[in-house]
Amino acid sequence: MSDRYELFLTCPKGLEGLLAEEATALGLQETREHTSAIRGSADMETAYRLCLWSRLANRVLLVLKRFPMKDAEDLYHGVLDVEWHDHLEPEGTIAVEFSGHGSGIDNTHFGALKVKDAIVDKLRTPEGERPSVDKINPDLRVHLRLDRGEAILSLDLSGHSLHQRGYRLQQGAAPLKENLAAAILIRAGWPRIAAEGGALADPMCGVGTFLVEAGMIAADIAPNIKRERWGFSAWLGHVPTLWRKLHDEALARAEAGLAKTPSWIRGYEADPRLIQPGRNNIERAGLSDWIKVYQGEVATFEPRPDQNQKGLVICNPPYGERLGDEASLLYLYQNLGERLRQACLNWEAAVFTGAPDLGKRMGIRSHKQYSFWNGALPCKLLLIKVTPDQFVTGERRTPEQRQVERENPVEVEVVERKLNKNGNPIKPEPVVVEQARLSEGGQMFANRLQKNLKLLGKWVRREGIDCYRVYDADMPEYSLAIDLYHDWVHVQEYAAPKSIDPEKASARLFDALAAIPQALNIDKSRVVIKRRERQSGTKQYERQSAQGQFLEVSEGGVKLLVNLTDYLDTGLFLDHRPMRMRIQREAAGKRFLNLYAYTATASVHAAKGGARSTTSVDLSRTYLDWARRNLSLNGFSDKNRLEQGDVMAWLQANRDEYDLIFIDPPTFSNSKRMEGIFDVQRDQVELIDLAMARLAPGGVLYFSNNFRKFVLDENLGQRYAVEDITAQTIDPDFARNGKIHRAWKITARA
């Protein structure tokens, strides 16, 4: 075999340049970059050194042969021609990995089988001995890559992927791979900072991957020094004496590195469940004397190194893949920016994020940005110098305004109540907090919210209303519906049309989310965001989350439960407030029927108004259970019936009479539990006819729906006395959107 080999080193996408620099420094020559890989030439000593010392590679592949390939037979014979007796004993074990397609190979499993068959046929002895397959820990791992008609056959010297260092046996929900974490540290300048005696802190450390990788860099520990089994361990071309020499050198360097004064490396994690797993990982890496982990929130993050040295703050905040994460993540990034400005002046910072728009909300400019991939997710590494000249102070604030803000900081009262020795509350000292920084658009949006609050204030106070809409896409570029539920804010983002640039829409959303707590004087932890878009079938009623948190609100003397987090709607349609109040006024002594009852809020109002009985019909058991809680919350008994069923089928089977009926159907609905599909425009006549058949003499039916294109069938006007009462059912908070719903009063003709 030759003294020099062609090597392929694979890596995560985006790390190719860094890996090329690292591999060249370790001795690789003629280095060239490819997508998610580099290649070059090296002797065996360099190949071993790359396996031991590469912090960035996934695998080190030693190329055995390249050959042209037109079909499966070319593949088989190309592999068969290799002298496999130089690489593996006949009774050894193999695993084959195949990548690429073409040349008659469209199935990687088939390609791997052809490679395996060729190796087995070559090594089969007259006595019948032959290699067997071991996919977990084979003696030899063979890789074949098919690239534009060329087959590249390699041995995998690394065995398991090199990112698996052996210390991280416990991990959190969204861990970074170790080699990606190392790449981020290198890009952030940690090797330089560590050499200068600088500190490192991670305010969201999870199970400590950044911390351990940083410790190994600072202590000059080879990342794979503790690996016991390699892809070359049973390879017949392995040179054990050379390997032991390099491994002993690495052990000596690690011993010398750990004997130095430890770098100050600290991690902080809000989730108490991750603290011990993080400490266990650090202990397995042998770095317990160097790295400490504590429980702590971002809001209280303040690194205090022993020698007061500066250093690097590094973190991988959540990105927000779930619907509704935007608000909480925006405030997390804002908090991170505030802590950097207040507690880390003159430090360097590195923020790795899959949501660069959120990174812009920290209020500090990044001086460099690098593109990475975390699996299939494109990400950015934002490098920041935490100095005042990099602080973003808001577009609309003049130097004079900033001076006023410095001299007159905002004060907020602490919610927590403390008692003196006599058991009486102690008024807490106000906490000085930094003024929120809004963009020009964000400030305009905040001004509109405050204007709306002022306009609605007198009406809200007079009516004693607890929940109301304060904004409904008043400014087209901020397409949101914002509702106040006592001291909570429910934000619904209307899905932007395809013609709108998604990045601009995202930036405006973040502007709005930054403005809402300040404009409405609401704690940012009490802002919930959802996205509204055209729903099909039962999707509009599907669960969005599973927090199960209910908030008690009041309306017209009744108490109602709302859930702001788990479903698209909250359990209370605010636009129907006037209709519910009308029902309460008219219900005394009457038998009330509520069709498509949802959470039966109208039934609660009817019961409050003195209804003789209420019957609520809905297809959803979940919402009927919610309705039962609403009724129980107000002390109403079993005279208030809850019926689960398809409304149309229920009406056809029912023979009772009712004095007051309310119908608020969905625009469209289908379910496994209902017969057919309901379409309000198509099925309105049948629905109203069935309901009117159950209306007692002198009774009233109220019909409403939210379908903006709905047209009431003119035949209904000929059959019954029909009055459009829409204008009477729109309160001031929905006056900006007169098409929020339509409503009619229907009675029998005299």
Swiss-Prot record:
Pfam families: Methyltrans_SAM, RlmL_1st, THUMP, UPF0020. Its EC number is 2.1.1.173, 2.1.1.264. This is Ribosomal RNA large subunit methyltransferase K/L. GO terms for molecular function: 23S rRNA (guanine(2445)-N(2))-methyltransferase activity; RNA binding; rRNA (guanine-N7-)-methyltransferase activity. Belongs to the methyltransferase superfamily. RlmKL family. Specifically methylates the guanine in position 2445 (m2G2445) and the guanine in position 2069 (m7G2069) of 23S rRNA. One of its GO terms (cellular component) is cytoplasm. Keywords: Cytoplasm, Methyltransferase, RNA-binding, rRNA processing, S-adenosyl-L-methionine, Transferase. It comes from the Bacteria. NCBIfam families: PRK11783.1. It catalyses: guanosine(2445) in 23S rRNA + S-adenosyl-L-methionine = N(2)-methylguanosine(2445) in 23S rRNA + S-adenosyl-L-homocysteine + H(+); guanosine(2069) in 23S rRNA + S-adenosyl-L-methionine = N(2)-methylguanosine(2069) in 23S rRNA + S-adenosyl-L-homocysteine + H(+).
